[in-house]
Amino acid sequence: MAIRTIVWGENVHDQNSKIVQSIYPDGMHSAIAASLNESQFISASTAVLQDAEHGLTQARLAETDVLIWWGHAAHNDVADEIVERVQQRVWQGMGLIVLHSGHFSKIFRRLMGTPCSLTWREAGERERLWVINPTHPIVQGLGPFIELPNAEMYGEPFAVPEPMETVLVSWFEGGEVFRSGLTYQRGAGRIFYFRPGHETYPIFHNDDVKLLLKNAVQWAHNLAPAWRDVNEAPNRPIEQSLEPLEAKGPRLHKDGEGGLR
C-alpha cells in the first residue's frame, strides 16, 4: 500500500503574496504533494491552517503514515489541541518531516524541547547543500551536493538537540554554514528536519529537492503497527512478575492503583 502522506501548509503567504503566488499558484503545499504523487510508493494529500481542525482530525491522523509540515508567519495560530494530537501520533509511529521555517513551529519545538533558534538573512544568495552521509536512504540518487541559486540563509548556532544523524550541511554565498538535514526519533516516530524552502524562491520545483523529499517520506514511514498505548504506564502486580517475588519494605501505592503524573 502507498505511504499515506499529508502535506500541511500554513497557506498565508500563498494567499497574500503575489510573488509566492507567481511561483506556487496553487500553494506550496499543493506543489509538494504533486511532486510526491509522482512516486508510485506515495499517496499525498494536503491540509492547511484555515481548514477545520487545521485539516488534522483525529480520524485523518490515525490513517496518516507521514506528515510534512511547512509554517512561517502563523505558528502561534496553530491550536495547542492539534499540536498535542500530532505529537501523540508521532510518539505512536507517524513520521514527521519539518521544512525550513517550520523550525519555529509549535510541534517541532515541543518535540525537540529546545528553542530551535538560528541566525538568518534574506538576500537571495547561493546555497550548496553538501551530502555528508552519502549512504543514508534520504540522499540516494543525489550527487555530492544540491545547489540552489537563490536561498534564504540560515546560520549556526542552531539550537536543537544533537541529532541521530546529520545528513546534509549547507554552505552559503555569504560564508555561513548550517546543519540542513537532521534526523531524530521521538517514541516510535521518525523525524527529519530539512532546511530549504523559503517561499519566494522555486525551491520545491527543484528536481533534487523533489527527489530528496520522496526519499524522506519513505525513510520516515514506520512499517510497524502503531504504538497505540505509548502513553500507558500500568502498575504491574507482583503476581504477574516473571520470577517468584516477595514484597519487601513499605509501599506508597495500593494494588491496582494508578501511578502519579
Which functions belong to the PLM regions below?
Residues 17-105, 255, 259:
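Helical hinge/lid and interdomain linker segments adjacent to catalytic or ligand-binding clefts
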Residues 10, 71-72, 197, 221:
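Cell-envelope and extracellular/periplasmic
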Residues 16, 200-208:
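A short acidic/glycine-rich loop-to-helix N-cap element
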Residues 213-228:
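Short, hydrophobic alpha-helical segments
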Residues 42-43, 62, 118-195, 229, ...:
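Catalytic beta-strand/loop cores that center a nucleophilic Ser/Cys/Thr
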Residues 6-10, 99, 194:
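Short hydrophobic segments within beta-strands
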Residues 2-22:
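Short glycine-rich His-centered loop
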Residues 74-142:
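A glycine-rich, often tryptophan-bearing local segment used as a flexible ligand/cofactor-contacting loop or short
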